[in-house]
Amino acid sequence: MSMFCYQCQETAMGTGCTLKGVCGKTSEVANLQDLLLFVVRGIAVYNEHLRREGHPSEEADKFIYDALFITITNANFDKAAIIRKIKEGLQLKNELASKVTIANAPDECLWDGNEDEFEEKARTVGVLRTPDEDIRSLKELVHYGLKGMAAYVEHAHNLGYQSPEIFAFMQSALAELTRNDITMEELVQLTLATGKHGVSAMAQLDAANTNSYGNPEISEVNLGVRNNPGILISGHDLKDLEELLEQTEGTGIDIYTHSEMLPAHYYPQLKKYKHLAGNYGNAWWKQKEEFESFNGPILFTSNCIVPPRANASYKDRIYITGACGLEGAHYIPERKDGKPKDFSALIAHAKQCQPPTAIESGTLIGGFAHAQVVALADKVVEAVKSGAIRKFFVMAGCDGRMKSREYYTEFAEKLPKDTVILTAGCAKYRYNKLALGDINGIPRVLDAGQCNDSYSLAVIALKLKEVFGLDDVNKLPIVYNIAWYEQKAVIVLLALLALGVKNIHLGPTLPAFLSPNVKNVLIEQFGIGGISTADEDIMKFLS
């Protein structure tokens, strides 16, 4: 076994990747990511002690969420970049260690090493370092929730929003994960606390996005192309998009969104740019084919990278920024001294490229985040009371490569016409281009936005609970049938559990990192379930 990773839904054989990641990461990269996470836990222990003394390190705060983000599925495949981050972390850890003394410090605090020692150490600090499978399962569940939370924290930070309370929790949780004597009950409570702070992190990002760009509104998004050279922007970071739009305005270059960047078109302060031309392509996993025909440069702002084939025509057109890493790609450095990122090289490259080749046409409707749906509340409530809407189906989450995900297309197609789908995240691409119609002018697919906008769906549910005078969110006519893929979906799930939502169905498979006993806890306490066939599930959910 040269590595072990089971953090994503597509993990090999449904048990774990041991030779190379299904995502495309090498065993070396996987092991180095384990070592980076090990270093992060040590930094967290030191910074938690410094926080108790009243002077935590802001540099440590940022390093921790940035490093966690790097280890998310499909974010960083660059061995050299991860080694640099480990070295940076060890230096930071040593600086913190000089300021505080810790009795009985864990190995995460004590270990130091040179690059030639990284590989050997990495093999001892991965997932399998914890022998008890239930403790291991819960530790990894918390780890993955923290990774998802870190992504949301970083995007909010880029817009000038941060929370000392969230930093404090993340670091105290990481410190707890260094304990060898931690109990299953303690970890269950830590898991629930992770969900609670996940709600706070999503609320913070929602505030950052809406205060910066306005509340999402019902918007029509073009799926075709124009005749100008284009830049395709993928990932989730709206600040990167804003700066790119500003720097390309008046240059004759059009900007197209890809996958999870689609909801940018719903924000008033982003869609005002006339050269934000449309959305190109589908969910992240189809990029190897779709990027070939785009013809212009592609900018990755966060996880959603699929390493290109060796003979891919677009390899030299890939640009990355933020936590992203891909060997051979052009890197856009971070902001310095409050100045925007410099996209001039990317823009110059785009000017030398042909316009994108059309791969589809038509439009999409979206923008149904919580403020927009609340504005339509009277119409929605009347439709429910009259029986025009029988049930809502929350089908948020992620898309992926597996053929079993065709279930979600079939499920959406077969739902009765008196049902409405509430969605967020790239799971929407399984059904957002189907002609599912509307109910009294309300589209049957209401897209709230990116995966973090699952927060909007929770706010909508809580608002409906209030409007209908119910004492329990689970009494609403809402079914949760969520598709998961990576760690941001994990924090969304934990956040929903923290909000009291029960009977969530998760697919296409349950996570490999859930041991049988942990799975039973989730089933017994929260009603977590899997999926079967579209026909069987629709019959069950509507009964």
Swiss-Prot record:
One of its GO terms (biological process) is response to hydrogen peroxide. The modification Cysteine persulfide is found at residue 398. One of its GO terms (cellular component) is cytoplasm. Binds 1 [4Fe-4S] cluster. Its EC number is 1.7.99.1. The keyword 4Fe-4S applies. [4Fe-4S] cluster binds at residues 5, 8, 17, 23. Its main location: cytoplasm. Keywords: 4Fe-4S, Cytoplasm, Iron, Iron-sulfur, Metal-binding, Oxidoreductase. Catalyzes the reduction of hydroxylamine to form NH(3) and H(2)O. This is Hydroxylamine reductase. The lineage of its organism: Bacteria, Pseudomonadati, Bacteroidota, Bacteroidia, Bacteroidales. The gene is hcp.
